Amino acid sequence: MAYSYTEKKRIRKDFSKLPDVMDVPYLLAIQLDSYREFLQAGATKDQFRDVGLHAAFKSVFPIISYSGNAALEYVGYRLGEPAFDVKECVLRGVTYAVPLRVKVRLIIFDKESSNKAIKDIKEQEVYMGEIPLMTENGTFVINGTERVIVSQLHRSPGVFFDHDRGKTHSSGKLLYSARIIPYRGSWLDFEFDPKDCVFVRIDRRRKLPASVLLRALGYTTEQVLDAFYTTNVFHVRGENLSLELVPQRLRGEIAVLDILDDKGKVIVEQGRRITARHINQLEKAGIKELEVPLDYVLGRTTAKVIVHPATGEIIAECNTELNTEILAKIAKAQVVRIETLYTNDIDCGPFVSDTLKIDSTSNQLEALVEIYRMMRPGEPPTKDAAETLFNNLFFSPERYDLSAVGRMKFNRRIGRTEIEGSGVLCKEDIVAVLKTLVDIRNGKGIVDDIDHLGNRRVRCVGEMAENQFRVGLVRVERAVKERLSMAESEGLMPQDLINAKPVAAAVKEFFGSSQLSQFMDQNNPLSEITLKRRVSALGPGGLTRERAGFEVRDVHPTHYGRVCPIETPEGPNIGLINSLAAYARTNQYGFLESPYRVVKEGLVTEEIVFLSAIEEADHVIAQASAAMNDKQELIDELVAVRHLNEFTVKAPADVTLMDVSPKQVVSVAASLIPFLEHDDANRALMGSNMQRQAVPTLRADKPLVGTGMERNVARDSGVCVVARRGGVIDSVDASRIVVRVADDEVETGEAGVDIYNLTKYTRSNQNTCINQRPLVSKGDRVQRSDIMADGPSTDMGELALGQNMRIAFMAWNGFNFEDSICLSERVVQEDRFTTIHIQELTCVARDTKLGPEEITADIPNVGEAALNKLDEAGIVYVGAEVGAGDILVGKVTPKGETQLTPEEKLLRAIFGEKASDVKDTSLRVPTGTKGTVIDVQVFTRDGVERDARALSIEKSQLDEIRKDLNEEFRIVEGATFERLRSALVGRVAEGGAGLKKGQEITNEVLDGLEHGQWFKLRMAEDALNEQLEKAQAYIVDRRRLLDDKFEDKKRKLQQGDDLAPGVLKIVKVYLAIRRRIQPGDKMAGRHGNKGVVSVIMPVEDMPHDANGTPVDIVLNPLGVPSRMNVGQILETHLGLAAKGLGEKINRMLEEQRKVAELRKFLNEIYNEIGGRQESLEDLTDNEILDLAKNLRNGVPMATPVFDGAKESEIKAMLKLADMPESGQMQLFDGRTGNKFERAVTVGYMYMLKLNHLVDDKMHARSTGSYSLVTQQPLGGKAQFGGQRFGEMEVWALEAYGAAYTLQEMLTVKSDDVNGRTKMYKNIVDGDHRMEPGMPESFNVLIKEIRSLGIDIDLETE
């Protein structure tokens, strides 16, 4: 196998047994693809597909005026260019967006002509606001902050059948219901009541009998009965009736008389119940008719109107129960045929018929009026209004849309074969739904499971943005309709008709403040990827936390391979927010799909199919770990499979599909936990959640025991620099990498140069530090998509969230009681868990009523010492080390003129003293902060003079840009002359540039000429002359292009910044704060084993082994058994082996052993102990040495989830590393030097420092701000609040009888205003006494009682 640039430098020993059938897909595809589809940027007019923006425009346009004389049509749209790139947008605090220009056509019709002749057409491009662009990493920059739009898992549109689980009625009877959910529009519900009548609700309003809706659709009673029932036909034969016999219908009835066959043999005796056997005999006998007495039809319901044959008079209405009176009329009138409804109590209930009986309406108009009254109570109904309302509800494309998904789900559920159709409902749809509902009530068919992933779909960014955009367009439509009527008379253009504000506002609101638009979690690369792969059931149109029950949150069998069963937050959102599984993707309808290998006749093929939850139900799916032979045939007699959402076993011949990988079940975060299969699910959940909170350490350290997913996460997260094209590294320094692109990847006419600017020490959303470090050296060859620079938390292109620590599991002096962690001082000395945090502090100079605020170094009443870190403009120097209270930006604000005394006036007149007009409002370093200034940005309003600092910052930025462009030109020029040299050497010159005719051109000749002289050469061959001309033109062209680029950047930098109204200048100061690990910080492993650092011990006191190597961390062994996360123990053992092997390699290198010996040892590690074979023979000797040097600190291992290292392999590795196979060692106490009683498990575990740092939580207050009403101190660090002394604490003091302490707590330390001021003054005077007074809360209590109208007073004597 071919190794990439970074892979060959450090190969991971992989323990997986199963072959890689399919690579893990690009992890951010769900975001990028969705938004690309929405924008369809770069598509021409004919290429536009009916999705995204295009679909939104087409659904709202054309807009036709009320009179119908003018129309506005949509032609197409185009997106402009963004004003600033992503980095500039973040700095300036603006949105990264492009202008949207829409081409519309205004058509004015001729009023006079009868056939609507066109009078005038105007076409114009209209600006429709800005559309935010997605960055290449799937985020949006909104007002300068990176945000992510989380995908939503919502109920798919379509029709759903359900029952109330017996909860509505006291009898526990199941009440069935059906609900038609459109993509937009009114919901339609059908439901049974306890008396078995069917009702309908529109938009969850008051219920009406379902027959009202059918009547409103234009069905008569007879048509309704015809649709839902079959009929029994009776012929009247004098006193008796003859029934047209369908034997099946008699089943379960009691025979009213003997039933005889043709020969007179009795088949069923009178009074006997008719069974299936009897029915078989009847069918055999071929009896077509059955004589029954007249009263047999008593109580049955008529299916058709019964009419007097002679007079035409109606004897019985349709759907009437037959009684003796009607039967007498029938006999008298000599009616020959009666049709009754066939119903029974088992599988054909009289529900629709009963519903018709309770329905008060009798024709279509009455039904429409009834619906109008329900929808608009209190309004007088008219025929037109009722008809319009009803048509608009379900039959108008403007108001109702099922969407393609909805129509597909609808048709599938009611058993139609076609999956396409109209977006609105039709009569047949509604009848079909009712029929299905009645069938389910009759016991045919089953209800739906709403938590099945075939009934829930994912709405991604693009779709949600499109919906918001449509909302904005609909608002515009109303305004345009009104203006269209004026368009003709006033000769308006399309631009005058359309106001883009509502559209822009709708889009801005969605990206800025929607519940699903979340502030990007930038703790580390994993947290970014996880947020982008989230699916949330919350949000607009979704569930709410309070209403979501247990079922919705639970793991469902269809989650397999689509949604991770492990990763979900703890707390109120559990199960509502999920993560996509590693291989999952969405299909065209938005349902989640998972990949499977096709299996035919027990043979596993290479073909891979993606199936949604609905499609996979009928398949028999084997697990990825099913045993196969070399011919890829399943060899077990019975294979463990999933079928119909159940786990079972089947023969290999029955298997139709097979999983592609064992990790397709879990999400990215869970697949980073080694030995996940040995951890309890609850702890694995904590483990995957805590990896997201790991803070990037100063020096990233790859995990010794990983899972092989680390590289994918680092590559796809976008924090690393990945080569866009292959080539050779031309130059590299800390801030940029320049690649000369390989010739075969250069497109014609463009410079073969890629310049990658690295991000240096910038602030992330979580105030952690983002910094990239190059991995390549000058002259290295890189291929496309090789990793060239590491980002935060990545080490040689692998995710590295924490540090490998030598740990021992032992209880030690109570320092690790209750999950506490005992650390060695060495960890602090080596800066293993030191992190850098970057804080942004902002100073804003505004225009006030009394005059402008000024940023200056001239601050009143501030000593010289406080100003020594500021430059002449009053802004702190970069590189200054500052502490709490230091001035960062000097700023003075004018204050109102105070009345001056005559003496002051005199001094003013003499000295011109102005200092008292302004007060000092400088930006100071907040309390508890100490750090180094690493960057300063100054933004100045247009028209305000820029200070020296702003100009110097601008100059340095321009120098950087110029340097970049010069570099690009240098390489282009060099490459061009190289090509010319290879073309010219050995050819003959005609003259020019001081050469003689016929002189041969050699390298020496060319070296003797300046580059400019080359173009003066005249060659014998015309083709060469042409090449020279082209080269000259190309170089001149490039130079001009780069100069234009420079001017453009310069113009951008020099134009004023767009600041908020009233703001003159903004100065942003960035502080880098270095935080070492200290007691109180939270740490964790990857298995949910979290704890707080309790004590940092000197190295010499820590337990050490026989060689004197001390451990770094001592963990409590009691944290393992009850939590059942044994994965951490296995990780520790394998970590020990990895480290031991690294030490062996290190010794070999130090002894300068031959490369062949190294190769042999590496081969033993990689290829002789289980797992995947590595092709070390492909590496050159130098590469092997390089590899060995990188393995000195330990051989990294990969143990993929559910396919990891076995116990035997771990032992073999320990043996190879010359370590005890038990993984346990004899330790000695560093304090006493005594042996511990028994051997202790020692090894290497990957530990993370989580973003819950004691520095951010610790805080102290003596005095500060107080609450307005109660006058008690505020709470919380943000408000600089106090410690709460609550009700129970008061009880404790009462119980101890500590009266004075209690009095102090309730008065001077809390809300006795006079007492506390007095006490403060006393302390200042050195007089330590207090006089408690009346607490303010008492006054509040009195006021509250008075507000109830009770007069209450405090009697003082």
Curated annotation (Swiss-Prot):
Its EC number is 2.7.7.6. This is DNA-directed RNA polymerase subunit beta. GO terms for cellular component: DNA-directed RNA polymerase complex. DNA-dependent RNA polymerase catalyzes the transcription of DNA into RNA using the four ribonucleoside triphosphates as substrates. It comes from Pseudomonas savastanoi pv. phaseolicola (strain 1448A / Race 6) (Pseudomonas syringae pv. phaseolicola (strain 1448A / Race 6)). Keywords: DNA-directed RNA polymerase, Nucleotidyltransferase, Transcription, Transferase. InterPro entries: DNA-dir_RNA_pol_bsu_ext_1_sf, DNA-dir_RNA_pol_bsu_external_1, DNA-dir_RNA_pol_su2, DNA-dir_RNAP_su2_dom, DNA-dir_RNAP_su2_hyb_sf, RNA_pol_bsu_bac, RNA_pol_bsu_CS, RNA_pol_bsu_protrusion. HAMAP family: RNApol_bact_RpoB. SUPFAM superfamilies: beta and beta-prime subunits of DNA dependent RNA-polymerase (SSF64484).
